[in-house]
């Protein structure tokens, strides 16, 4: 890990990404051995921060900064391993780049990953496409069932469906 050009420390109750500025993003990417050309574009992301970063004389990369204290190193590495397994099975996913022999890098207080930039689009929702999406999801689940994840939380009906429903009902979020 490293810490360059970070500026003032964030306030105690500041947003988890308050110290993530453009200089820090570029420094983080360059710490992996990739020479940045200064281009930086923030991309949509729900809970993390994701950027497209220009690389000198190469295609841009996509860099994902994980929300501090949300995921452990072990959980992220388990996800990376699964993405690699899916890639080897020729599923249409994007596995992280290995830079400096690693897929997960540290720039305190952030863990981050570099991905190749891959284009995509929303699928047409015709019957053939829906069947293809269904087959792909089936393959994903089949590959995922080969080994038991040790660190990632399990998505279950009881834990994510019933518990969420109970919370909404118990706290009057759903009108009568």
Regions found by a protein language model. Give the residues of each.
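Residue-level recognition of alpha-helical structural elements
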Residues: 39, 126-129, 176
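Conserved NTP-binding catalytic cores of kinases and kinase-like/nucleotidyltransferase enzymes
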Residues: 2-97
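Active-site catalytic-loop/activation-segment of kinase and kinase-like phosphoryl-transfer enzymes
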Residues: 7, 13-14, 153-176
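A generic short alpha-helical patch detector that favors 3-5-residue windows
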Residues: 17, 106-107, 156
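Short secondary-structure boundary/hinge segments and terminal tails
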Residues: 47, 104, 118, 158-159
């Amino acid at each position: 890990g490293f810490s360059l050009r970070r500026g003032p420390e964030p306030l105690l109750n500041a947003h988890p990404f308050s110290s993530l500025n453009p200089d820090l993003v570029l420094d983080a990417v360059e710490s992996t051995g990739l020479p940045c050309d200064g281009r930086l574009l923030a991309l949509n992301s729900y809970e993390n921060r994701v950027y497209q970063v220009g690389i000198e004389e190469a295609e841009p990369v996509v860099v994902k900064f994980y929300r501090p204290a949300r995921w452990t190193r072990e959980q992220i590495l388990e996800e990376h391993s699964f993405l690699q397994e899916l890639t080897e099975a020729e599923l249409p996913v994007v596995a992280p780049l290995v830079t400096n022999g690693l897929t997960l890098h540290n720039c305190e207080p952030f863990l981050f990953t570099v991905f190749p930039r891959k284009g995509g689009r929303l699928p047409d929702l015709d019957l053939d496409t829906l069947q293809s999406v269904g087959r792909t999801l089936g393959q994903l689940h089949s590959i995922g069932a080969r080994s038991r994840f040790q660190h990632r939380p399990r998505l279950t009906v009881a834990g994510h469906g019933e518990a969420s429903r109970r919370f909404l009902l118990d706290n009057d979020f759903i009108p009568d």
